[in-house]
């Protein structure tokens, strides 16, 4: 089941969880969506600022698999 997150700090905490498997980054013309797959939920964070999205991408934990879509 999907859940939406509004805070970047909450997303980073979720990405560092032990059951977080993969992060998908989906870019379109208006915003960037970060989707982290955990064992029970798919958490989504929508970022409207491209610079913040790039910083968030660089601050993801190194052990997690990252896939960029479009």
From Swiss-Prot:
In Gene Ontology terms, what is one molecular function of this protein? Answer: structural constituent of ribosome
Q: What is this protein called?
A: Large ribosomal subunit protein eL38
The lineage is: Eukaryota, Metazoa, Ecdysozoa, Nematoda, Chromadorea
- Organism of this sequence: Ostertagia ostertagi
| Keywords, alphabetical | Ribonucleoprotein, Ribosomal protein
**Family membership noted in the UniProt record:** Belongs to the eukaryotic ribosomal protein eL38 family.
Q: Which Gene Ontology cellular component annotation is one that this UniProt entry carries?
A: cytosolic large ribosomal subunit
The domain of life for this entry's organism is Eukaryota
Query: Which BP terms in the Gene Ontology apply to this protein?
Result: protein-RNA complex assembly; translation
Family matches, as InterPro entries: Ribosomal_eL38, Ribosomal_eL38_sf
**PANTHER family named in the record:** 60S RIBOSOMAL PROTEIN L38, LARGE RIBOSOMAL SUBUNIT PROTEIN EL38
């Amino acid at each position: 089941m999907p859940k939406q997150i509004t805070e970047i700090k909450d997303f980073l905490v979720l990405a560092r969880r032990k059951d977080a498997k993969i992060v998908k980054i989906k870019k379109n013309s208006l915003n960037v969506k970060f989707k982290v797959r955990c064992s029970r939920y798919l958490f989504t964070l929508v970022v409207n600022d491209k610079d913040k999205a790039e910083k968030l991408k660089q601050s993801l934990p190194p052990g997690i698999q990252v896939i960029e879509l479009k």
